[in-house]
């Protein structure tokens, strides 16, 4: 088995971070590059249900704020937690996380996707531990490459 590129999608939740040890271990075992992917929220997808769109400038301002916040958090995470990986690259995408993960798996020519069994949804909704998260479930079913799932504690 040859693994040159590992894609680690994260929503920066505490559950998502539980995959860090496996990401570091696998990247060192295979001397693989780690691509860290964060997907920003597409706020426009929420507004049709409410009837009115907010001012586009405000949406852009919020998106810019979220991207900057995510970039800072990802840089800190990589500096503190992934510093022992051979090579790290950060990617930010906008929109549906599943779509972004699948697209980046192909774009980055990932050999492996590493995910935690749950992410932000479990933090917000208190999803039972025995139910796999919706993003992870969809990636397992649709991924063109192998998926390594880290069971959350």
Describe each model-derived feature in a short phrase.
Residues 1, 15, 79-113:
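Structural beta-alpha unit
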Residues 1-56:
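Small/aliphatic-rich secondary-structure junction motif
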Residues 35-37, 89-93, 148:
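General small-molecule cofactor/ligand-binding pocket signal
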Residues 43-44, 100, 122:
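Generic structural signal for helix capping and beta-alpha/helix-loop junctions
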Residues 55-72:
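A short acidic, glycine-rich active-site loop
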Residues 69, 92-96, 153:
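Short beta->alpha linker loops
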Residues 104-153:
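Gly/Ser-rich helix-loop-strand patches that form or flank binding pockets
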């Amino acid at each position: 088995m040859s693994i040159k590129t590992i894609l680690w999608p994260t929503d920066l939740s505490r559950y998502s971070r539980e995959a860090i040890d496996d990401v570091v271990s696998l990247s060192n075992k295979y001397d693989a590059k780690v691509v860290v992917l964060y997907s920003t929220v597409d706020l426009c997808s929420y507004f049709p249900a409410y009837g009115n769109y907010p001012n586009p400038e405000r949406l852009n301002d919020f998106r810019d704020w979220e991207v900057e916040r995510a970039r800072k958090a990802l840089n800190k995470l990589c500096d503190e937690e992934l510093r022992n990986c051979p090579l790290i690259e950060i990617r930010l995408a906008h929109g549906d996380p599943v779509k972004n993960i699948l697209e980046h798996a192909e774009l980055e020519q990932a050999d492996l996707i590493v995910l935690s069994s749950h992410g932000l949804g479990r933090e917000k909704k208190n999803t039972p531990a025995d139910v796999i998260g919706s993003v992870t479930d969809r990636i397992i079913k649709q991924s063109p490459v192998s998926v390594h799932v880290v069971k959350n504690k």
